[in-house]
Every structure is written in C-alpha cells, then in structure tokens.
C-alpha cells in the first residue's frame, strides 16, 4: 500500500469555519396599516365577457406593393435555356 497523499489527508480533515449570524429579510415588508381587500373575480370576469364598445376606425391600407401600371413581366425562358444546355452537352 502506498503512502497517504497529504492533499487528500488535508481534505478529509476538513476546515474550521467561523460562526456567522444571518439576517433573513425574505419576508415581505407590509405595514400594519395596509389591509388587503378580497378580490371579486366573478365580477371581473363578467365585465370582461361583456366586452367594450369600440368606435369605428377609418383605415388607409397601404400594405399593397406600389407597382407601376406600365410594368410587365418578361416571359420565362428557363425551358429554352435547359434545351440549349442539353444541346451543348450532346455536342461535346
């Protein structure tokens, strides 16, 4: 059996800790003059279910893209391009 490691012996011995006093401040600070009323959820829910009267709003929808009337879409020449590529590949 090998000699005991001094580092492990020191760890097993432990450390002497000083005593400390803690101040627990986790409790809520509510003054004695503060009184919490009962919350009436039923009346709140009925008020929400009734809804609100909304006024009509005029809108000016500008979300459509502005495309000039003279703008045209060019024809798609993809199939002609592929045919040209196939013809050049066959010639090679």
UniProtKB/Swiss-Prot annotation:
It comes from the Eukaryota. Residues 68-79 have a biased composition (Polar residues). Monomer. Keywords: Actin-binding, Repeat. Pfam families: WH2 (PF02205). Induction: Down-regulated by phagocytic stimuli. Is able to bind two actin monomers at high concentrations of G-actin. Inhibits actin polymerization by sequestering G-actin and stabilizing actin dimers. Residues 1-33, 54-92 are annotated as: Disordered. This is Actobindin-A. One of its GO terms (molecular function) is actin binding. It comes from Dictyostelium discoideum (Social amoeba). Residues 13-33, 54-64 have a biased composition (Basic and acidic residues). Residues 3-20, 40-57 form the WH2 domain. InterPro entries: Actobindin, WH2_dom. Coiled coil: none annotated.
């Amino acid at each position: 059996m090998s000699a005991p490691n001094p580092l492990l012996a020191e760890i097993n011995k432990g450390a002497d800790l000083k005593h400390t006093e803690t101040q627990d401040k986790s409790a809520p600070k509510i003054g004695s003059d503060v009184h919490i009323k009962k919350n009436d959820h039923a009346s709140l829910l009925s008020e929400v279910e009734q809804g609100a009267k909304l006024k009509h709003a005029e809108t000016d929808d500008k979300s459509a893209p502005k495309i000039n009337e003279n703008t045209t879409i060019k024809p798609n020449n993809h199939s002609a391009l592929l045919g040209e590529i196939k013809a050049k590949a066959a010639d090679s």
